Amino acid sequence: MARVAGVNIPDNKHTVIALTAIYGIGRTRAQKICEATGVKPDMKIRDLTEEEVEKLRAAVGQFPVEGDLRREVSMNIKRLMDLGCYRGLRHRRGLPLRGQRTRTNARTRKGPRRPIRK
């Protein structure tokens, strides 16, 4: 298994698919990385040379991925909550942020039903 950005990426998958195992890299970004480094997207990770893996590491290193990206996202959410804006309040209360109805739906965001106590 090749190790890129602190993640073991699977050997038996094509390069484009294997790169998506890294948090912050989806299909489109993985294709752009392969294009920029000159690595064939349909080549398996185990068939890559060490030089090609190094190119991939360098290309992935230019983007915020894994821990840095997770920290950035959580800091953005925390900032919204500290500001006290509408989105921050919705985050704090665990409700949907983008205008969805909450009277009947939104079970995923609100969690399981709690019985009404008398």
From Swiss-Prot:
Superkingdom of origin organism: Bacteria
GO biological process assignments: translation
A Pfam family annotated for this UniProt entry: Ribosomal_S13
InterPro entries in alphabetical order: Rbsml_uS13_C, Ribosomal_uS13, Ribosomal_uS13-like_H2TH, Ribosomal_uS13_bac-type, Ribosomal_uS13_CS
Keywords of this entry: Ribonucleoprotein, Ribosomal protein, RNA-binding, rRNA-binding, tRNA-binding
Annotated region described as Disordered, given as residue ranges: 94-118
GO CC terms of this entry: cytosol; small ribosomal subunit
GO MF annotation list: rRNA binding; structural constituent of ribosome; tRNA binding
SUPFAM superfamilies, sorted: S13-like H2TH domain (SSF46946)
Family recorded in the similarity comment: Belongs to the universal ribosomal protein uS13 family.
HAMAP family to which the protein is assigned, alphabetical: Ribosomal_uS13
Function (record text): Located at the top of the head of the 30S subunit, it contacts several helices of the 16S rRNA. In the 70S ribosome it contacts the 23S rRNA (bridge B1a) and protein L5 of the 50S subunit (bridge B1b), connecting the 2 subunits; these bridges are implicated in subunit movement. Contacts the tRNAs in the A and P-sites.
Subunit structure: Part of the 30S ribosomal subunit. Forms a loose heterodimer with protein S19. Forms two bridges to the 50S subunit in the 70S ribosome.
UniProt-recorded name of the protein: Small ribosomal subunit protein uS13
Protein species of origin: Thioalkalivibrio sulfidiphilus (strain HL-EbGR7)
Lineage: Bacteria, Pseudomonadati, Pseudomonadota, Gammaproteobacteria, Chromatiales
